[in-house]
From Swiss-Prot:
One Gene Ontology CC term in the entry: cytosolic large ribosomal subunit
Record flagged with keyword Cytoplasm: yes
UniProt xrefs under InterPro entries: Ribosomal_eL18, Ribosomal_eL18/eL18-A/B/_CS, Ribosomal_uL15/eL18, Ribosomal_uL15/eL18_sf
Family of the protein in this entry: Belongs to the eukaryotic ribosomal protein eL18 family.
Gene field: RpL18
The protein's name: Large ribosomal subunit protein eL18
Molecular function GO terms recorded: RNA binding; structural constituent of ribosome
Provenance organism: Anopheles gambiae (African malaria mosquito)
Example of a GO biological process term: translation
UniProt keyword annotations, A-Z: Cytoplasm, Ribonucleoprotein, Ribosomal protein
Subcellular localization(s) per the UniProt record: Cytoplasm
Length: 189
């Protein structure tokens, strides 16, 4: 009689390469894998690992957030903000300070505003030449839980102290807004 072996721990479930077939992304991974191996700097390891991640884990960041975090860190104009994701424009921001940004993508409007105010935009291969160990850089990322789908996660909708959004087919007064919420439909709490 055979032994029932538990294969639960056999494989490590984590990405070792990007799932995307984008050749430029795989070249960046190759570059940062080399840099991490040669420099042993945590910055290169984090950049490499974030390049593997799925698109949902590359959340976008607004110009306002980038500028705020740079100001918060008290960084000078030589420092580079590093975002492994997209940098987007923020129309609520009147004046954009001088920023040096390195990102996978920068939207057209954000690019215009950064360059207009004397800032610079680097690609990750340019950053590797400029700062191979991550000196004078500020690594930042957008909020991963900002996606609409996260509003549906958590305690079941309807139970006490739950702020979770229900998945509803209809939004009329006779549906989620009815029983327990109006006296004409059973009761009202």
């Amino acid at each position: 009689m055979g032994i029932d072996i538990n294969h639960k721990w056999d494989r490590k479930v984590r990405r070792t390469r990007p799932k995307s077939l984008d050749v430029y992304l795989s070249l960046l991974v190759k570059l940062y894998r080399f840099l991490y191996r040669r420099t042993k700097k945590k910055f290169n390891k984090i950049v490499m690992r974030r390049l593997f991640m799925s698109r949902t884990n590359h959340p976008p960041m607004s110009l306002n957030r980038v500028a705020h975090l740079m100001k918060l860190r008290g960084k000078d104009e030589k420092s580079v903000a590093v975002v492994i994701g997209t940098v987007t424009n923020d129309v609520r921001m009147m004046d954009v300070p001088k920023l040096n940004v390195c990102a996978l993508r920068v939207t057209d409007k954000a690019r215009q505003r950064i360059l207009k105010n004397g800032g610079k935009i680097y690609t990750f291969d340019q950053l590797a030449l400029l700062s191979p160990t991550g000196r004078n850089t500020v690594l930042m990322q957008g909020k991963r839980t900002a996606r609409e789908v996260f509003k549906h996660f958590g305690r079941a909708p309807g139970v006490p102290h739950s702020n979770t959004r229900p998945y509803v087919q209809s939004k009329g007064r006779k549906f989620e807004k009815a029983r327990g919420r109006r006296s004409s439909c059973g009761y009202k709490n």
